[in-house]
């Protein structure tokens, strides 16, 4: 993640109801730092999205343990709803598999976000829990996808 990519990501604005994904309070310097767990998704030299790995993928109120690596992400707003999400997420997960070799990936998705839920389920994620966030009271789904040892590279 470069400082320029991080600065661009925090300006992205999604239409309602997806505006809950706007990163209005995020600090570009943190997103660009090595400790943030953020990685840019770049296609032909153009920033198209990002993936995060670690605590950023968790929502306050969810029941999380260390049995899976949390991952979150976003697609540039003008690219959403065009059928690109599945490939973007799959590419990010492949990177995460190579980089971190987790036993499982875990995603937390807003319950209203049927597009994202459909995509992650098509990628092998299975529902394990639902909860209400501590802030705002929105409903979220937690889904997990085990990673077979044979597919891990570390």
Predicted regions and their residues:
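Short glycine/proline-centered loop/turn elements that form peptide/ligand docking sites
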Residues: 89, 113-115, 133-137
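Conserved GNAT acetyl-CoA-binding A-motif
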Residues: 98-108
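Conserved acetyl-CoA pyrophosphate-binding loop and the N-cap/start of the following alpha-helix
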Residues: 79, 83-91
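Conserved catalytic-core motifs of GNAT/GCN5-like acyltransferases
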Residues: 108, 124-141
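Amphipathic alpha-helical recognition patches that constitute DNA-binding helices
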Residues: 70, 104, 115
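Conserved active-site alpha-helix within GNAT-family acetyltransferase domains
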Residues: 86, 111-129
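Acetyl-CoA-dependent GNAT
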Residues: 3, 11-78, 95, 99, ...
């Amino acid at each position: 993640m470069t400082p320029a990519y991080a600065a661009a990501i925090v300006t992205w604005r999604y239409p309602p109801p997806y505006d809950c994904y706007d990163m209005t309070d995020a600090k570009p310097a943190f997103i660009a730092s090595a400790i943030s767990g953020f990685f840019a998704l770049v296609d032909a030299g153009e920033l198209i999205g990002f993936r995060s790995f670690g605590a950023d993928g968790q929502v306050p109120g969810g029941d999380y343990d260390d049995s899976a690596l949390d991952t979150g992400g976003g697609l540039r707003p003008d690219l959403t709803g065009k059928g690109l999400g599945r490939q973007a997420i799959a590419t990010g997960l492949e990177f995460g598999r190579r980089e971190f070799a987790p036993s499982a990936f875990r995603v937390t998705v807003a319950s209203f976000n049927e597009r994202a839920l459909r995509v992650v389920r098509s990628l092998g994620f299975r529902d394990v829990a639902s909860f209400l966030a501590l802030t705002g009271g929105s409903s979220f789904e937690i889904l997990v996808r085990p990673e077979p040892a044979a597919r891990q590279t570390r």
